[in-house]
Amino acid sequence: WNEELAEKKAAYVDRRHFNPDFVNPCRFVQTLSSKMNDDAIYVADVGQNQLWSADNYVMKHGRFLTTGGFGTMGYSIPAAIGVRAALPDTQIVAVCGDGSFQMSLMELATMRQWTLPIKFVIMRNGYLGLVREYQHHTYHDRYSGVSLDGSPDFEKVADAYGLDYFHLEHNDEME
């Protein structure tokens, strides 16, 4: 049944429409998965990024880690650190939204203290995106508590922890 599911996923056409002025998150996850090692561990945080990851990540022989439907925002950083400690020779990539990342970014200090190389992808949209999407559909665009105005400059956060940083702005920069 694994082969059957793989065939269905390969034939799946994502019909969602995204603003062409921004990076298409589904295409990004597909491209990212094609660049990852065969045995890589992909850690998906909670939110829209989790949905895009579940729909578009193509796993080879590694693992896909997520909290499922438990809604534990901030999961990806400590989970990735734990996986890195357990599997020091395996590529680890953690994908999260800007809200989730901020919920446990202090754990970057732990990562640096123990010299644990992990790649983080922050899908930044300036909102608690999945909560905002729910409020859009359920409360007819009456939003409350979803804006992330005042978020830090993530390049400066990376610099403060001695981490490399790259900002992807357009779809043609993915390769």
State where each predicted segment sits.
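General structural feature for long, well-ordered alpha-helical segments within catalytic domains
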Residues: 24-28, 38, 49, 104-107, ...
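Short gly/pro/ser/thr-enriched loop/turn and capping motifs at secondary-structure boundaries
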Residues: 50-51, 71-73, 101-102, 126-130
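Short glycine/serine/threonine-rich phosphate/pyrophosphate-binding segments
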Residues: 75-77, 100-107
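A short, small-residue-rich loop immediately preceding and capping a beta-strand
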Residues: 89-103, 118-123
